Amino acid sequence: MRFTKIASVFWLVTGFALPPVIANTSATANNNLGPAKLSVYVAKKAGKSTAKGRSKTKHRAARKSQGPAREESFEEVFPPGHKFTPDEKAEASTLGTYFANAMWKDAYKLSTKSVKQHPERWWLHAARAAAAANLNRPKDVIDAVDSAIRTNNGDANRGNLTELKVLKANALSRMGQKSTAISTFLEAASTSPRDPYSRAGAAWIYATAADAQIRKGATAVTLATEAARLSHEKDATILDVLAAAYAEQGNFALAQKWEGKAILSGDSDDIPYYQHRLGYYQANKPWRENSK
């Protein structure tokens, strides 16, 4: 549904340009995250897109130790049937500005204050979760996601719920709760049969977890292959996951093939991380979340 008089709604992130999970911006700090995805909810004002003329905010998670993340421009996805009050429009517009400019502390502060005043507004909880993820506050991410899901009362669509669950899964992974993170990724995948990032998130953990009891190479390959198919083999971060999955299986030829494709199609900022992993595969070594 499209609203023509709202300036800007909110951003729901599942992966972030930060240092792991995706939320820590150093290249070495992101060893335990899975994939991430950024979705921005933006309305139109006076029939004209607010995204026009705005520089695209990029959120990457293909750091040295992380899994996939989609780089995405502003996208119009609105809660079906929701009627925004003037007060909500003002909050959404301010949050939209903060997210567009990566002002995560301001977004977190405002959303935290706002949910105390209006705990029934699920999209404020979702915005708080996104901001918390970018500030590397996984416990707050989980709390905010649970609150958003609990209070949406059917207002959130399937895409909203999928992204919330992926966001929570990444936070769980960040906290070292790998098995629970996998379960949450798979729950997100069942919510949206066509979402590649939930599948890639689970595949990343199955392929790269430090705990051998968690790793399942065959399952990782199956999930990563499906994620690659759903993304038409055009998302370098997912191809990177597929490479890690094959490496865990011991198929280093295919690991090199897919990592090479990730390098060819990846963003220039991410390529060094792909190249580093490729070096492991060329040496017949799988990638681990604690690899150096």
Residue ranges, per PLM feature:
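Terminal, low-structured helical/coil segments at or just beyond the last alpha-helical repeat
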Residues: 67-84, 214-218, 226, 232-292
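Short coil turns that delineate tetratricopeptide repeat
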Residues: 85, 119, 153, 159, ...
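Alpha-helical segment of the N-proximal tetratricopeptide repeat
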Residues: 86-117
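Residue-level recognition of tetratricopeptide repeat
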Residues: 96, 130, 170, 204-211, ...
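Register position in tetratricopeptide repeats
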Residues: 100-101, 134-135, 174, 208, ...
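Canonical tetratricopeptide repeat
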Residues: 127, 160-163, 167, 201, ...
